[in-house]
Design a protein with these regions (language model features):
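Metal-cofactor-dependent catalytic cores
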Residues: 2-284
């Protein structure tokens, strides 16, 4: 029988940080890190780049599953974009941080913020890779995008966020994934859920009830469970959507309070610091 730490209290086992991930470009692949710096917007270099369409509106795998075919690989002071199925498209190098250049207003959900333009080469590469006109833009430190601007009770500290959907950090546990996979005909990897912080040693599903925790002594605040969408059904290696709607369909059978299918926890954290894989996670 799979081991989910059932019957144990969270305090009776050591909870540790087992994975750290950044996604330099929103809705593209992630990079696994052994350690990361904390910033006011989340992990350093996480979701600071964004792909927008001809109307300067954000693009994600929700409407463009083919974005999963654009792999992101670490490179010196930046990353490479590589198309998994089109080797004739030479990899594109991008720095983690853009240089000040032309600006434009872009829309992400209900927010309109200004961003720096990337490069003509990046725009051309992405337009060819995705089969439609698009641009790559960067969020400067001078841009303010507040977490939950219409719900200040969820953001008492005035936390800001990058181009992430809503919060600086997304946390998931290995045990919750193991519990889900035990119910699936075809198990799914953690990359379906795009977390920043992965922990092990917790009770399955327990993260949804955490009020707060610390990593290496640095405080984080759990805000609310993360409502999941169709992206979880997209194979991140092939861009093919699961015809049965899995794993979302199975998750909905036991993790659907208030009409939202939840997996993982939205989190805010300190404005500075450093975390490493293997760090202790302490609840409370």
């Amino acid at each position: 029988m799979p081991f989910y730490l059932y019957g144990m209290s969270a305090s009776s086992s050591a909870i540790t940080l087992s994975g750290i991930f950044i996604y330099p470009v929103k809705s593209l692949g992630g990079i696994s890190l052994p350690a990361a710096e904390l910033t006011p917007r989340g992990l350093r270099h996480d979701r600071r780049w964004l792909i927008v369409d001809a109307r300067n509106r954000f693009m994600t795998q929700r409407e463009h599953a083919e974005m999963a075919l654009l792999a992101v690989e670490p490179a010196y002071n930046g990353f490479l974009l590589r198309h998994r199925q089109r080797p004739e498209l030479l990899p594109l190098y991008m720095p983690f941080e853009a240089q000040p250049d032309k600006t434009l207003f872009v829309t992400i959900w209900d927010d309109m913020v200004w961003a720096w333009r990337g490069t003509p080469e990046a725009d051309a590469w992405l337009s060819e890779a995705l089969g439609q006109p698009c641009k790559l833009v960067y969020m400067s430190d001078m841009v303010r995008r507040d977490v939950e601007p219409d719900k200040p009770e969820l953001n008492p500290a005035g936390t800001v966020v990058s181009f992430a959907d809503g919060y600086p950090y997304l946390l998931a546990t290995e045990e919750s994934l193991a519990k889900l996979n035990a119910q699936l005909e075809e198990p799914v990897p953690m990359n379906r859920f795009r977390p920043n912080l992965v922990v092990s040693g917790a009770l399955a599903d327990a993260e949804l009830s955490w009020a707060g925790f610390s990593i290496a002594g640095q405080p984080f605040r759990s805000v609310r469970g993360c409502g999941r969408c169709i992206v979880t059904t997209i194979d991140q290696a092939t861009a093919q959507q699961n015809p049965a709607g899995e794993p979302l369909r199975t998750l909905a059978t036991y993790r659907k309070p208030d009409r939202k299918v939840l997996f993982g926890q939205n989190v805010t954290g300190p404005a500075s610091g450093r975390i490493e894989v293997g760090d202790a996670v302490v609840l409370g």
